[in-house]
């Protein structure tokens, strides 16, 4: 097993018995996870591998947050505490955490009823409202968004690290996190990507679609370049990566929200919009607006968020999507094709959303 964790030392630190089996779960982009069965039970062992989120102090902070959320009844899976009183084990310079194993499955919005979509929106609203209660209020300034988004892969264990197209990547260099991408930077990025597409050999169907979408997006940006959003609105503590692969369902109900590595201070309503866009996008690149409406109304109610806050968030996330090419950058600049299956729907969504802008705003804020 590659990257095998130091099970002996870890299990001693958590007094979790002796290992019987240890199997890697489907490997996430940012961290590594293992389904661990010992003489004392079943666990999810998480190796915090991503340098951006592997600081033990930051991990301990998100652990404390999930413990407090659990006390409020939010479905989370807080880590176990070691014999030293800590939840983070640092062994050989690597940070680990041990969580209870949560049986469950991931569900996309297409697998949810309208009523379940409303419960999903209410759940995220409860998360945001609860974080306001359990996290410090001093020094609440928006964190700089990561320039990395992830490929869609998931794990069924508590605390798993799975990432999907959160649409939050900085599509162009020099992004002002308070205002979003500058169209001039995006035009330069489009030109660079087009040159890479032309040079790619053998030229295939993905290259043809990429070229088509890049030219299409450039035309859209030329028409809408003056719609860059103003300074962002009110901020609060958010999960930071709320999407189908970080939510486990059991018997039709949410069992656990996992992967809190991106816990931070950001505009709350933008997380609600990004999550809905991921949950409710159809393969053709359109949103299921009936489900969006049910979700958004429930979110606004439980998060005490007004229509104007949601409408502003819709505009900012739309602009973010219009300027976002992280999947193509992975494909052509990194040679990483894991996100390729997402590209057809994600790239079509920006076009559809621009055409149906008012209808989408109404679904979230009406």
Predicted segments with their positions:
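Active-site activation/catalytic loop segments of kinase-like enzymes and analogous catalytic loops
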Residues: 269-304, 317-336
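Juxta-kinase regulatory segment immediately upstream of eukaryotic protein kinase catalytic domains
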Residues: 1-20
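Active-site acidic catalytic loop and adjacent metal/ATP-binding pocket
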Residues: 29-37, 44-45, 79, 224-270
């Amino acid at each position: 097993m590659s990257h095998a964790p130091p099970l002996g030392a870890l299990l001693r630190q958590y007094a979790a018995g002796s290992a019987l089996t240890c199997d890697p779960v489907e490997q996430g982009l940012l961290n590594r996870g293992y389904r661990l069965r010992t003489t004392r039970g079943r666990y999810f062992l998480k190796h915090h591998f991503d340098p951006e989120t592997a600081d033990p102090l930051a991990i301990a902070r998100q652990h404390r947050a999930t413990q407090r959320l659990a006390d409020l009844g939010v479905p989370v899976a807080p880590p176990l505490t070691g014999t030293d009183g800590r939840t983070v084990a640092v062994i050989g310079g690597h940070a680990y955490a041990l969580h209870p194993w949560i049986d469950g499955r991931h569900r996309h919005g297409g697998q949810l009823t309208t009523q379940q979509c409303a419960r999903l929106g209410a759940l995220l609203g409860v998360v945001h409202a609860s974080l306001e209660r359990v996290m410090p209020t001093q020094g609440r300034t928006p964190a700089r968004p990561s320039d990395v988004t992830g490929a869609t892969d998931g794990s069924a264990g508590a605390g798993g690290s799975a990432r999907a197209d959160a649409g939050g990547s900085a599509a162009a260099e020099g992004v002002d996190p308070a205002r979003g991408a500058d169209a001039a930077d995006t035009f330069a990025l489009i030109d660079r990507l087009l040159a890479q597409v032309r040079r790619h050999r053998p030229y295939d169907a993905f290259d043809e679609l990429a070229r088509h979408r890049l030219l299409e997006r450039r035309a859209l940006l030329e028409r809408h370049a003056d719609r860059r959003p103003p300074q962002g609105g009110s901020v609060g503590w958010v999960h930071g990566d709320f999407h189908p692969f970080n939510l486990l369902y059991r018997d039709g109900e949410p069992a656990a929200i996992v992967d809190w590595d991106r816990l931070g201070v950001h505009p709350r309503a933008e997380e609600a919009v990004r999550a809905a866009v991921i949950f409710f996008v159809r393969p053709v690149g359109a949103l299921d607006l009936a489900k969006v409406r049910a979700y958004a109304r429930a979110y606004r109610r439980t998060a005490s968020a007004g229509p104007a806050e949601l409408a502003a968030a819709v505009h900012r996330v739309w602009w973010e999507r219009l300027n976002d090419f992280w999947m193509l950058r992975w494909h052509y600049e990194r040679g990483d094709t894991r996100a390729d299956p997402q590209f057809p729907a994600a790239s079509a969504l920006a076009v559809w959303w621009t055409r149906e802008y008012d209808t989408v705003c109404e679904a979230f804020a009406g």
